[in-house]
Amino acid sequence: MTAYLIVFCLCCWSAARSANILAYFPTPSYSHQLVFRAYVELLAERGHAVTVIRPLTRVDFNRNAGNLTTIDLDGDGLLLLMKASTTHRKRGIVADTDTVTADNYEALVRMVDRQIHSEPFQRHLKSARRGYDLLVVEAFVDYALIASHLFGDVPVVQISSGHATAENFETMGATSRHPRYYPNLWRFNFGPLSVWDGVRELYTELRLQREFGLLADRQDALLKRRFGPEAPGLRELRSRVRLLFVNVHSVFDNNRPVPPSVQYLGGLHLHDRRAEPLSEAVARFLDESRRGVVYVSFGSGLATEDMDADMAAALLDAFKMMPYDVLWKHDGRVDGLTIPANVFVQKWFAQFEVLQHKNVKAFVTQAGVQSTDEAVENLVPLVGVPLMGDQAFNAHRYVELGIGVALDATRLTAADLARAVEQVTSDRAYRENLERLRRLLRHQCASPTHKAVWYTEHALRRDGDALKTKAANVDYAEYCMSDLLAPLLSVSLMSHLHSLIRMFVW
């Protein structure tokens, strides 16, 4: 009997044994790293040995959360990239669809390449070349997938801190690039469109596909140049991806049809909250406000000090017009600005704690994913002023879901902003819609934390590819069955041509 118990225990231990996981998250963004920290600490607490390679940001990873090791890289890359962008930003900080080019995004690829060739990364590569069971990598830049080759051809899980790109979905064989229902998130114009506007947006979809195709070609060339002619290309690297985590609720992605190899999490960082107490001055400002407070923050991805004088003046004039007090996150100098008496300016706020406060009436935001999650959780109506990336799509969803309004940052006036704040604070419907949406997001069959751990451990098993669809990572010619369509179109064309010849010649 004892022998059977020993065998049983050994089998159980074998089935539940910890894995050696490498995580590489190259983007030096506070909001991105918040999500990644929540994810890897879950894995470490589960008993897996996790090594994280990431640039330094304000986000500290808890090295006491199980077997968790961090390898720190330089963290200044993102803002330097933003400032060095070759395309002029509108009003100083607005990077709309026109700025989405292969040239601009190639700089991001080169940032990842510099990280991989940095001394800390290379030192770890030499000491642990073939010791990992799984690579977890940020989904934003596919060039980072080369780590799966460098560390011994390991299987891959990709995780996006927010929305996934069209290329991520194509890698998994999910629906993508439908210009109306599942549009490219780099667009800035959504919603009901005239016929002519619809044609222009279709052109934008095709242009974006071309730009990212050019970027993929350049990444392939760089991979061969930096890692040798035998290095795998992007298509081969993408084939190693077993699972994609998308950290938005599916309702924000139009309930896109996806295979089981794509899992929506949504609000993962909310399950890893470390309380940041409000400073005494901020707490007093919030507590003593008799009119209520509007919180204004455009995130950490762009420096608000770079906005042009016209936009800064529009914001300050709007603050002066509002019948509320204002907390404004501004990372630039204020000595050259005339700050209204009702405005408290600071370079950094404990955002979630601010939004929790009972006196906060509205949130003027760039419409980032994490900011949206925090506003919904705290039932704060939103005024979206998108500046870059997927933010225009998020702001568009505010309007569709009835939880806020969206403004065009390139044309923003003081009157527009003041009117929008008055609209979301005076109409009870916005808060009611937020309550309804929060109930929906909380009512899930499994929590984001449970899904993140369960599906990662599924990907670790030998049958980890079982979740993937046959359409995963195929090119457009194969996906559209060109081998069948081309002959059919040729026959149809020849038939019509023959009819025309008979009509006009015979």
Curated annotation (Swiss-Prot):
Keywords: Glycosyltransferase, Signal, Transferase. Residues 1-18 form the signal peptide. Its EC number is 2.4.1.-. One of its GO terms (molecular function) is UDP-glycosyltransferase activity. InterPro entries: Ecdysteroid_UDP-Glc_Trfase, UDP-glycosyltransferase, UDP_glucos_trans, UDP_glycos_trans_CS. PROSITE patterns: UDPGT (PS00375). It comes from the Viruses. It holds the Pfam family UDPGT. Transmembrane segments: none annotated. Belongs to the UDP-glycosyltransferase family. Catalyzes the transfer of glucose from UDP-glucose to ecdysteroids which are insect molting hormones. Expression of egt interferes with normal insect development and block molting. PANTHER family: EG:EG0003.4 PROTEIN-RELATED, FI06409P-RELATED. This is Ecdysteroid UDP-glucosyltransferase. It comes from Lymantria dispar multicapsid nuclear polyhedrosis virus (LdMNPV). The gene is EGT.
